[in-house]
């Protein structure tokens, strides 16, 4: 009888071990893939589902800047390239297929204004110079935009140092965004939470 009990316990422990391993594997291959930088990847479908529960904030880095590229400028050399404008328009088309209910903001630079304009497909744009200043005060600035938007979703075109700061501050990860890369946050009970990196598709 004792031998049977010991064998049962041993088998049960083995089963528990297998079950635990399966849970881990399932978690890694489920809804959220993970970027190499340690941030969860948020695709359009996941973003749309999140937006049904909370007001979401999507912060994009501007498109390819002209003064750091050999590509043709869209207009002013302090703005973006033609290639960057086309990429912003394509991104906006895909984004708007998943999220339609949002207010659009940008910092007060030519490159962010142009990026947001080409992304927007005619949506009105509000320029806010505070989206250029990125430090601990960025969260209060974002919350102000949410209040102005009456808790609608918010899309902001800003700068790489803003995204880098938020990723480090909220998740402790090093995030070096390329042009038009983005972070997804949501607001709940007056606080902002970083959900991950937006990955179109």
Curated annotation (Swiss-Prot):
Belongs to the phosphoglycerate mutase family. Ais subfamily. It comes from the Bacteria. Residues 1-35 form the signal peptide. Its EC number is 3.1.3.-. One of its GO terms (cellular component) is periplasmic space. InterPro entries: His_PPase_superfam (IPR029033), LipoPS_heptP_Pase (IPR011310). It is found in: Periplasm. Its main location: periplasm. This is Lipopolysaccharide core heptose(II)-phosphate phosphatase. The keyword Signal applies. Pathway: Bacterial outer membrane biogenesis; lipopolysaccharide metabolism. GO terms for molecular function: phosphatase activity. GO terms for biological process: lipopolysaccharide metabolic process. Catalyzes the dephosphorylation of heptose(II) of the outer membrane lipopolysaccharide core. Keywords: Hydrolase, Periplasm, Signal.
